[in-house]
Structures are given as structure tokens and as C-alpha cells.
Regions:
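Face-selective signature of the C-terminal outer-membrane beta-barrel domain
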Residues: 181, 216, 220-238, 248-372, ...
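C-terminal beta-signal and adjacent terminal beta-strands/loops
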Residues: 22, 558, 566, 576-626
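Membrane-embedded beta-barrel scaffold of Gram-negative outer-membrane proteins
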Residues: 269-283, 382, 389, 423-481, ...
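Extracytoplasmic beta-strand/coil segments of soluble accessory domains associated
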Residues: 57-96
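Short acidic/polar hinge/loop motifs at secondary-structure boundaries
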Residues: 96-123
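Periplasmic-side early beta-strands and strand-to-turn transitions of outer-membrane beta-barrels
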Residues: 140, 148-152, 157, 170-249
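Gram-negative outer-membrane beta-barrel transporters
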Residues: 349-356, 449-459, 479-559
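N-terminal periplasmic "start-of-domain" segments of outer-membrane beta-barrel proteins
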Residues: 20-49, 78
Length: 626
């Protein structure tokens, strides 16, 4: 219907002039977005700026339907994406995994956006390329590539919600064979009181305040024309201020990657990465050792691309050494496992309008002695203004060291026991998507795209907990186990329009239905209907002055979770950005425009107490005239 309306307004041209970014996550090889047979969502740098997002949690919540962040029992953020919990979604930074977890979720505070150029999201299983945890999807944060000789940006942002401050500095230079990117970000926020401490209905009374410091360095060196070496390092520190104690979260990460280009599509990539994520608890400034946690991962990765006639072949292998020491193990002892995998992929254009990609991968995990072979087959048909994508993908998640070996006394209420006999979770994902795109001519010169996707994900042997009675080996508590799975199916619609007048708009709607035992483990009953939309206006008013305005909305239908029956809601956000003399950017934001206030705060309720305001200033020092 939208396409017909646009046709009536101006007429459809045969080609599109919208930006067509190159993506890497769906196939592990650079490929134009319009040519990728696997449905991929890209959130570009302009979108990141428009949303005024601080971290990946803010960005995904604003841009994607079918996704919701709530809170775990630890009062740390927990993700539900398309009916899957955080441990079924694989988060990557430039294609590399992250160590550590907070109640089955990565620490989303680590994923700030200070040096991110785009975010690529692949929904559905992707284990045939990425192995464990890619059961429900992959979210890959790609670093930006600065091409100027040097850049220097300083920025600061204040939010009335919790009197929050975010300050950052980003510097890059390019000289001869060297390129460098350095990013520093510091943020702090006060505790926000959501409900009265005696509110017996609310599960969540406060959002705890704290501070975050993050430093990242990325150094690129080209010793010869065809060889690129990429060294990186990062430091992260977060404090979460609770009533009687403070939790500390620290991460140290480093890596080295080499890419040699043989020419004509042939290249070899070899990398090593190390990531250490630690947690500890302090009372009155003193380390208690009661909640010590340390996860250390060493990963070696190799990838080889080889064109053979019409075929593009990809071969890869990985090795990971995973060590975990935690207060949830007996006597804080450490456990270790290694995993190894090998995979292959073919990519062929059988006809100018037909592309087929197939992948096969085998993984082995030593602790659970789990073997998993997963496959993916995707096809794309395209002709003028239309494309059809269809895919099958297998997914799996091996039991974690925590799920295998936990022996944890939960403050005297119950025991939680690991299970060395756990089997790997498995999934089968099916996708079918139709896309139509074109140009508009006439009074609304521009372009548009419409995508309609149906999906079904059958999840089996999922890991959850079951009651265990008192016997010679156990006290009363919970035991990790495998149980019957869940089927998640749905429909997603995306529509975008962009005009040369500076006006643009986008709407995304998701209908989701989950059947099976979806109330336990990482699943909660997902909301059936969700939608995001935004209307934007971008205009150069004068030579040294331009504006960008945006109004966005996020709608979520009522929760079907009997334990957390949150009502339907919508939250609106207005953003105004002014750019002066190419160097200064001043941003004003009104969030929760219509002052929505939940009456009861469940773990999946939006943590807002009404309208809040923020203002930010960003200065590109390199663009100033000295």
C-alpha cells in the first residue's frame, strides 16, 4: 500500500540512490547490504547520532521492535530479543566475543558507542558461522574508520534522569603507514527511586546509580601494501552503588589481528584476543572477597577467503581457552574448558538474479564433551525493485561452566546446583523476507524501501532449572537441567522513506508469538506487539548553520507474563540537534514526552518516573579555524 501511494505521488524510478553500506556480519565477508541473502539490519553513524544513545542498550531499545531490556534478580540489565534471553544472543565488537556475564547477559555498559561507526544485527540462528550463543541472533559493533589526517572531538552530555553526566574525548590520526584511534568516556548517574520501599506490588524499587570509565585504543599499521596489522586494547571500570555495598566490575582486553590481501578476493586473516572480566564487592571501602568473580578468555582465530570461478569460498577455525573462577563454585575454585571449531562457506551467484550461500560448522567443548554440527543455507532472488530472501539456519549453545559446576547457597534461601550431564541447546530457524524499494520523482524526490519478514525458531533442549528435593547429595534448591523447548514465530515489517527536502521517516513493527515452556530460564513471555517509528528533518539553513530534528516513538503491548503483567505503553522522544560552523554540535532532548509513569514496576517495566531532559555539546577541534 505504501509503495502504491508513493507511485501515485511521483512515479518510481528504476534505480535507487540511497546509501548501500557494505556489511560483514551475515557472511563474514564484505558484501553490499542489498546483496546479502540473510536479513541484516544496519544502524549507521547518523542513526546513532540521531538517537543520542549512550550505549548499545539505549540504541537497540530506540531502533528495534521485538526487543526489550528488563532487569535480572541481580538488578542488572537483562535482554529479551525475539523471545530469546541475553545468553542466546551473541554480542561482538569488530567480530570478537566478550568475556564475563551478569546473570546470563553481557555487561551492556561495556558496549558504549564512542568509537562505533555502525551496528549490524542478524536476527535468527547464526551458529554455522559464529558457534555457541548465536542461537537467537548476532549483534556486531563495528568501529568507525576515520580518513582525515587527524580528528579530535570532545563532548559532554547532561541528563535530568539521575543527574547523569557523560563526558568523552575521541582522537584519531593518519600518517604514512600508521593510523590510530583513541577513545575515552566517563559517565556517572545517581540512584533513581522508582517506587516506595514499602511498595509490595513492585519488584523494582530503585535503579542503582554508579560510574563508568572506559578507554579504548585501536592502532593500524601497514608494513607493506598488502598486509594490515591491527592492535587494540581497552580498559573498563564500573561501580554500582548499592545501599550497603558497592559492586566493582573491571575488564581488560587486548588483541592483535593480521590481514594479508593476495588480491582478487583472496585474503588471509589471523588474530589473537584476550579478555578478562572481573567482579568484586566492597563494604565501607573494604574488599569482602564474598563475590569474587573472574572470567578470562584466550581466542585464536583464522579466516581464509578464496574465489574459484563463480564461487567465493570461506574457511575458518577458532580455538578458545575459557577460565572461570567465581563465588558460585565450591570454595571459589576455578574451572577451565577449551573449545575448537572449523567451518566452511560457499557463496555463488548462479544467475544474475540468484545468489546462494551455504555454511557448515563443527564445534567441540571439552567441559561438557559437547559436539555440535550446524548448517545454514540462504538464497536470494532479486529483480528490478524487488528481492526475496529465504534461509534455514541451525543454532546451538553449549552449557557454560557456571551451568555445569555451580554450587551456590543463595543467601540461605536455597541451593543452586550445576549439572555436568547437561546437553547443548539446539535451534532451527526459518526466515522468509520480501523487499521492495525504489525512487520517488516529483514534489517528493527521494527513495523508499519496504520489507516484510516471517520467521520461525524452534528451540530444543534448552537449559533451565528444576526443583530438587533433599537427598544424600543435595539440599533443597534448584538444579540445572534440559527440558522441552519453545517455538518462537512472528512477522516483522519495516518501512523507510527519505526525501531530498530533508524529510525522512521509518516505522518497524513486530508481531511475536511464543509457545512452550517460555516462562522459565532465559525466556519470559514476550510482548506480542511492538513498534518503533521516527520522523526526521535535516536541513542546511545557512552556510555555517544546520539543524536536525527527530520525533520517535516506542510502543509495547501488554505483557503476557502472569508474574509481571505490565500494561501496554508508548514512550515518545523529541530531539533537536544544531550544527554551527561545522565544529559545534548542540543537542536538546525531551525523553518520555507525554510523561508516562508506570503504576507498578515489574522487572520488565520501563524504568521511567516521567519526562526528563538532556542537553549535550560536541566540539570537533579539528574543524575549528585557528
Amino acid at each position: 500500500m505504501l509503495g502504491l501511494l508513493l507511485f501515485i505521488i511521483g512515479g518510481i524510478a528504476d534505480s535507487i540512490f540511497t546509501v548501500n553500506p557494505v556489511v560483514v556480519t551475515a557472511t563474514r565477508t564484505p558484501k553490499a547490504l542489498k546483496d546479502v541473502p540473510v536479513v541484516t539490519r544496519v544502524i549507521g553513524l547518523d542513526d546513532i547520532r540521531r538517537t543520542d544513545a549512550t550505549n548499545i542498550q539505549d540504541l537497540l531499545t530506540t531502533e528495534l521492535p521485538g526487543l526489550e531490556f528488563g532487569y535480572a534478580m541481580s538488578r542488572e540489565p537483562a535482554l529479551n530479543m525475539g523471545g530469546f534471553g541475553g545468553n542466546a544472543i551473541l554480542f561482538l565488537v569488530d567480530g570478537e566475543r566478550l568475556a564475563g556475564e551478569t546473570m546470563d547477559n553481557v555487561d551492556y555498559s561495556r558496549l558504549n558507542l564512542d568509537n562505533v561507526g555502525r551496528v549490524e544485527i542478524v536476527k535468527g540462528a547464526a551458529s554455522a558461522l559464529y558457534g555457541a550463543n548465536a542461537v537467537g541472533g548476532v549483534v556486531n559493533l563495528i568501529s568507525r574508520e576515520d580518513t582525515a589526517p587527524w580528528t579530535l572531538n570532545v563532548n559532554s552530555r547532561y541528563s535530568s534522569a539521575g543527574d547523569g553526566w557523560r563526558n568523552g574525548v575521541r582522537f584519531s590520526f593518519k600518517s604514512g603507514r600508521w593510523r590510530s584511534q583513541t577513545a575515552f568516556q566517563q559517565s556517572r548517574v545517581s540512584t533513581i527511586r522508582l517506587a516506595d520501599a514499602f511498595d509490595t506490588q513492585s519488584d523494582l524499587q530503585t535503579v542503582w546509580g554508579g560510574s563508568v570509565v572506559s578507554v579504548k585504543e585501536r592502532l593500524i599499521y601497514n608494513p607493506i601494501e598488502n598486509l594490515k596489522l591491527i592492535a587494540r586494547g581497552s580498559f573498563f571500570k564500573r561501580h554500582s552503588n548499592r545501599t550497603t555495598y558497592t559492586d566493582h566490575y573491571d575488564d581488560y582486553s587486548t588483541g592483535l589481528r593480521g590481514v594479508y590481501d593476495f588480491g582478487i578476493g583472496r585474503n588471509l586473516e589471523i588474530s589473537y584476543s584476550f579478555d578478562r572480566y572481573d567482579k568484586s564487592r566492597y563494604v565501607l571501602g573494604q574488599l569482602t572477597n564474598s563475590h569474587d568473580y573472574s572470567n578470562r578468555q584466550h581466542v585464536v582465530h583464522s579466516l581464509f577467503n578464496l574465489p574459484v570461478g563463480k564461487w567465493q569460498l570461506t574457511f575458518g577455525a577458532d580455538y578458545m581457552n575459557d577460565f572461570l573462577s567465581t563465588y558460585q563454585f565450591t570454595d571459589n575454585q576455578g574451572k577451565r574448558q577449551y573449545s575448537a571449531d572449523a567451518y566452511a562457506q560457499f557463496d555463488i551467484n548462479l544467475l544474475p538474479w540468484l545468489n546462494i550461500v551455504g555454511s557448515l560448522r563443527h564445534d567441540y567443548f571439552s567441559a561438557s564433551k559437547s559436539n555440535a554440527t550446524t548448517a545454514r543455507l540462504a538464497a536470494m532472488l532479486k529483480w528490478s525493485g524487488f528481492s526475496v530472501r529465504s534461509s534455514y539456519a541451525g543454532g546451538f549453545r553449549a552449557p557454560t561452566l557456571k551451568e555445569l559446576y555451580m554450587d551456590f547457597d543463595m543467601v540461605g534461601m536455597m541451593m543452586i546446583y550445576g549439572n555436568p550431564d547437561l546437553k547443548a541447546e539446539r535451534s532451527n530457524n526459518y526466515n522468509l523476507a520480501f523487499e521492495h524499494y525504489g525512487n520517488i520523482r516529483g514534489c517528493f524526490d527521494g527513495s523508499y524501501s519496504i520489507t516484510l519478514m516471517g520467521y520461525c525458531n524452534k528451540y530444543d533442549k534448552r537449559i533451565t532449572t528444576t526443583d530438587v528435593s533433599v537427598d544424600s547429595e543435595h539440599e533443597m534448591g534448584l538444579l540445572y537441567c534440559n527440558e522441552d523447548g519453545v517455538t518462537v514465530s512472528g512477522v516483522e515489517f519495516n518501512g523507510k522513506i527519505r526525501t531530498q527536502l530533508g524529510l525522512s521517516a521509518a516505522v518497524s513493527y513486530n508481531y511475536l508469538c511464543a509457545s512452550g515452556n517460555s516462562m522459565q530460564s532465559q525466556f519470559s513471555q514476550p510482548r506480542r506487539h511492538s513498534m518503533t517509528c521516527h520522523i526526521d528533518y535535516d536541513k542546511q539553513i545557512f552556510k555555517n548553520y544546520s539543524i536536525s530534528a527527530s520525533v520517535s516513538c516506542r510502543y509495547m503491548s501488554k505483557s503476557r507474563d502472569a508474574a509481571a503483567p505490565d500494561k501496554a505503553y508508548s514512550i515518545w522522544k523529541a530531539t533537536l540537534n544544531q550544527r554551527l560552523v561545522k565544529a559545534y554540535s548542540l543537542t536538546f532532548v525531551i525523553d518520555n514526552l507525554f510523561n508516562y509513569k508506570p503504576k507498578v514496576f515489574y522487572l520488565n517495566t520501563p524504568t521511567t518516573i516521567g519526562t526528563n531532559f538532556s542537553v549535550g555539546l560536541s566540539v570537533d577541534i579539528d574543524s575549528l579555524s585557528f
